[in-house]
């Protein structure tokens, strides 16, 4: 893949994450942190059962150890297999700075002066002599230091022998260390120290920004200026509401920059909580705060909320707690691909009793929905996409919306077009196209996915030949399905043309190109709705 590296995260180019179908060297697909140890243990046990002798190495960043699944795997490694190597790649970063007791523990190891002195000597020894003898000397020195400094290193309590920390950029040292570790007959953990962005000064200076970004100036590291994003506007609106309501608290799972909460944090530092890459904990933590009268807002990517589905059901919704989930990156995420698209949240949330689901068409409506949700007595969720917002000027003060009531933007009698959230732009474009052909089209901003506005649906069902729904979500279980279900339950036999993503994982690429490829377009909707309108006209002519 070396000669194709310039195509990474580009349409039809290399994926930004490991993908088994892309290369034999990608032994496991990954995009969400914390899975390395469990997957590697599964491979090691499979090797043992098959009588194999290959070495299995799990490489996990220090941030991944803030995720509970890593410790669940640690609890099983020494019990399930005799041979496995875990590499802890410690650079003190995930997307943002690592937080919590685990990060402090790693930092304490790294900054201990005895370890620093020992590893300086170890490095010189490896460089001078090399080979297994030098590694064994280093190992004995480490054992002496560990017994002196900590009676029981955390990982050794789990049954893994601990080595390190060593310089992760010293290739000769790494090679000799791995040669030695391969001779051992028990699970081991190697702690290596690396620098995020090493070798490129702008990346070292902007480690948060350079975690994942688009085009930039290679000389300065600067990126083009952009319009305010949905995430930034969400956080600013939330901070404004928090100015007046001391019950509002904001929670993120290691994504303060991505969710925009780094705009909330300076204004309300005591009501901002970063729990690390721990989505399940974030949700249950929010539930606990809600039981004591606070109004937790859990800002999380749609794709990452999947990791906390059970707590959403069991700890929040079952207890009818007023936790608000603000789901960033809802819809197609673009270049990050299938591990990061937010195409399933409507399907996995709308079946939960008692939750209110909303999708704003623009940033002004997002502020209104935040106000609305924070006034509710129970759980709620707001979904909004990645990237720049619509550029609408917000009202001075947000207003609570009537629950379950859609906004009719224009009336019509032939077809009713519902565009969920920012997909309202496609609904307007379809209406304009149909009206040029002589049809009367109603354009509706649903606002609420649940409860759905049955009154408005019933009103138009008696007038139109068809409904059309646009959504940035899979069709199966999505908003269009909710419309069809509501009509069926009311005994209203009106066709519903659903424009959404198919029942498959969508690859990475530019949003507009992928929409064109998969028929999330006005043209695709037109091809499906015109026959229904033409049929209605023919029936009307026959009747007359």
Regions found by a protein language model. Give the residues of each.
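Long, well-ordered, tryptophan-enriched scaffold segments
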Residues: 91-234
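Glycine-/acidic-rich phosphate or pyrophosphate-binding loops and their flanking alpha/beta elements
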Residues: 176-179, 211-212, 229-244, 260-266, ...
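Non-catalytic terminal/interface segments that mediate subunit docking, oligomerization
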Residues: 1, 186, 194-306, 311-321, ...
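Structural signature of the thiamine diphosphate
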Residues: 134-202, 322-327, 346-395, 521-544
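A glycine-rich helix N-cap at a beta->alpha junction
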Residues: 2-11, 79-93, 114, 317-329, ...
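Peripheral docking tails and interdomain loops at the edges
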Residues: 215-218, 222-227, 334-336, 356, ...
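A short, small-residue-rich loop immediately preceding and capping a beta-strand
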Residues: 28-29, 52-67, 84-87, 248-251, ...
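Cofactor-binding active-site loop characterized by glycine-rich and histidine/acidic residues
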Residues: 1-80, 230, 247-248, 252-253, ...
């Amino acid at each position: 893949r070396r000669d194709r590296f310039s195509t990474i995260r580009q349409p039809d180019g290399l994926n930004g994450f490991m993908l088994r179908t892309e290369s034999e060297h990608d032994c496991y697909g990954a995009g969400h942190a914390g899975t390395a140890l469990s997957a590697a243990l599964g491979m090691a046990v499979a090797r043992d059962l098959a009588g194999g002798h290959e070495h299995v190495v799990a490489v996990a960043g220090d941030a991944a150890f803030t995720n509970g699944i890593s410790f669940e795997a640690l609890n099983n490694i020494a019990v399930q297999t005799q041979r496995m190597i875990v590499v802890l790649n410690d650079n003190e970063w995930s997307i943002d700075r690592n937080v919590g007791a685990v990060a402090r523990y790693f930092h304490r190891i790294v900054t201990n002066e005895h370890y620093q002195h020992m590893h300086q000597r170890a490095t010189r020894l490896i460089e001078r002599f090399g080979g297994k003898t030098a590694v064994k000397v280093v190992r004995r020195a480490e054992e002496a230091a560990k017994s002196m400094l900590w009676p029981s290193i955390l990982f050794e309590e789990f049954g893994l022998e601990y080595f390190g920390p060593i310089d992760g950029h010293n290739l000769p040292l790494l090679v000799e260390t791995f040669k030695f570790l391969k001779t051992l007959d028990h699970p081991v953990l190697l702690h290596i120290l690396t620098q995020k962005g090493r070798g490129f000064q702008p990346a070292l200076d902007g480690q948060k920004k350079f975690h994942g970004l688009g085009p930039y100036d290679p000389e300065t590291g600067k990126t083009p200026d952009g319009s305010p994003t949905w995430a930034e506007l969400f956080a600013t609106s939330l901070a404004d509401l928090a100015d007046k309501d001391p019950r509002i608290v904001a929670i993120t799972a290691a994504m303060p920059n991505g969710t925009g909460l780094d705009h909330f944090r300076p204004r309300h530092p005591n009501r901002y909580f970063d729990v690390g890459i721990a989505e399940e904990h974030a949700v249950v933590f929010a539930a606990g705060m809600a039981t004591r009268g606070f109004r937790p807002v859990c800002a999380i990517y749609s794709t990452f909320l999947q990791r906390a589905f059970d707590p959403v059901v069991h700890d929040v919704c079952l207890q009818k707690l007023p936790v608000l989930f603000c789901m960033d990156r809802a819809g197609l995420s673009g270049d990050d691909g299938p591990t990061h698209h937010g195409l399933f949240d409507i399907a996995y949330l709308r079946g939960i009793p008692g939750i209110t689901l909303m999708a704003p068409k623009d940033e002004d409506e997002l502020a209104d929905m935040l106000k609305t949700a924070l006034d509710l007595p129970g759980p709620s969720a707001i979904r909004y996409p990645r990237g720049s917002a619509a550029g609408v000027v917000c009202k001075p003060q947000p207003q609570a919306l009537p629950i379950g009531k859609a906004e009719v933007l224009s009336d019509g009698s032939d077809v009713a077009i519902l565009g969920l959230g920012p997909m309202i732009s496609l609904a307007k474009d379809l209406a304009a196209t149909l009206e040029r052909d002589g049809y009367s089209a109603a354009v509706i901003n649903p606002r609420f996915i649940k409860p759905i506005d049955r009154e408005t649906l019933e009103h138009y069902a008696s007038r139109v030949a068809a409904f059309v729904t646009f959504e940035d979500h899979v069709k199966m279980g999505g908003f269009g399905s909710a419309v069809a279900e509501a009509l069926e339950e009311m005994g209203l036999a009106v066709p519903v043309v659903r424009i959404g993503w198919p029942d498959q994982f969508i690859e990475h690429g530019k949003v507009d190109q992928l929409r064109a490829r998969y028929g999330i377009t006005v043209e695709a909707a037109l091809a499906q709705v015109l026959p229904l309108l033409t049929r209605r006209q023919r029936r009307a002519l026959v009747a007359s």
